[in-house]
């Protein structure tokens, strides 16, 4: 583990993790090559830098990883391959250090803490970024965690490590943005109108909101049933969300919603009516054109071939 000798990474509390598009593309390619159409996950190393509580993940590479499906405590990660790859990457860019590891989860697993403890030997306070390579809803397909020691209230119980969630962002340098724009331009369906795209985006966003609300409800139910410990920080955040909700019992607000809804429904009705009238006019014009073509065909003289008697 001589890899850690040249690394200077702060062990302070991590507040945010920034993931670059190149990392996402590399991880998806790794998954498609190794574990596509299977229940397996792939694991690799994250490279980047850490400063003032922000981890900037700019690169990554795959690492051979195997685990037993029946016994999660049995797993293997190739240390020699990992250290050889890091030395080669360091020759290319000495500013990139090991900042953690990634997994295609798509959620936390029982042996993740053991794998995380392994990376503690390479970098202080590593991050785990779980990438959902097959997302079912709109949003950032990354979830980041770092491990902390949880001290039990009962002094007789030993402390244990637990994962703490940290916010993630997708950011890119100017060169990366140009590449991503070209990729999106190639995969974008030009036959879909802007209105249809906006409606689809709104619908997807509402589905995502519904999923988040259901997740909050499930968490609160588990807390009430005593299956999960009470976390005051989460409850404070939920209370802040509820405090931001508008008071819908105000008459002026109810009237404004009604007027806005009526205006939108009127626009939809007029648009449908105009579209129907235009379609009817197009049908009539086509009928008239067809009749004119038929008359023109009928008015043409018919050439009768002459028959000569032998």
Curated annotation (Swiss-Prot):
MPN domain mapped to chain residues: 17-154
Keyword Acetylation applies: yes
Entries under PROSITE patterns matching the protein: MPN (PS50249)
Alphabetically ordered keywords of this record: Acetylation, Proteasome
Entry-linked InterPro entries: EIF3F/CSN6-like_C, JAMM/MPN+_dom, MPN, MPN_RPN7_8
GO CC field: cytosol; nucleus; proteasome complex; proteasome regulatory particle
Entry superkingdom: Eukaryota
Family: Belongs to the peptidase M67A family.
Identification of the protein by name: 26S proteasome non-ATPase regulatory subunit 7 homolog B
């Amino acid at each position: 583990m001589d890899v850690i000798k040249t690394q200077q990474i702060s062990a302070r509390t991590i507040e945010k993790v920034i993931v670059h598009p190149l990392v996402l593309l590399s991880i998806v390619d790794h998954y498609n090559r190794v574990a596509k159409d299977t229940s397996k996950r792939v694991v690799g190393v994250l490279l980047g830098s850490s400063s003032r509580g922000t981890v900037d993940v700019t690169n990554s590479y795959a690492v051979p990883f195997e685990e037993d499906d029946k016994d999660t405590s049995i797993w293997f990660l190739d240390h020699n391959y990992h250290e050889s790859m890091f030395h080669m990457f360091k020759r290319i860019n000495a500013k990139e250090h090991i900042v953690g590891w990634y997994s295609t989860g798509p959620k936390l697993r029982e042996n993740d803490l053991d794998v995380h403890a392994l990376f503690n030997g390479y970098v202080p306070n590593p991050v785990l970024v779980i990438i959902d390579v097959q997302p079912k809803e709109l949003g950032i397909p990354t979830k980041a965690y770092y491990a902390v020691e949880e001290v039990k209230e009962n002094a007789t119980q030993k402390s244990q490590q637990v994962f703490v969630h940290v916010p993630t962002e997708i950011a890119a340098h100017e060169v990366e943005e140009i590449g991503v724009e070209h990729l999106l331009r190639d995969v974008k369906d030009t036959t879909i109108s802007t209105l249809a795209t906006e409606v689809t985006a709104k619908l997807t966003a509402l589905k995502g909101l519904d999923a988040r609300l259901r997740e909050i409800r499930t968490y609160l139910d588990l807390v009430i049933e005593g299956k999960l410990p009470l976390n005051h920080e989460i409850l404070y955040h939920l209370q802040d969300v509820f405090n931001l909700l508008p008071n819908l019992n105000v008459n002026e607000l109810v009237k404004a919603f009604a007027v806005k809804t009526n205006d939108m429904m009127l626009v939809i009705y007029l648009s449908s009516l105009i579209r129907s009238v235009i379609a009817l006019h197009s049908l009539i014009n086509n009928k008239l054109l067809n009749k004119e073509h038929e008359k023109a065909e009928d008015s043409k003289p018919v050439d009768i071939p002459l028959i000569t008697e032998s």
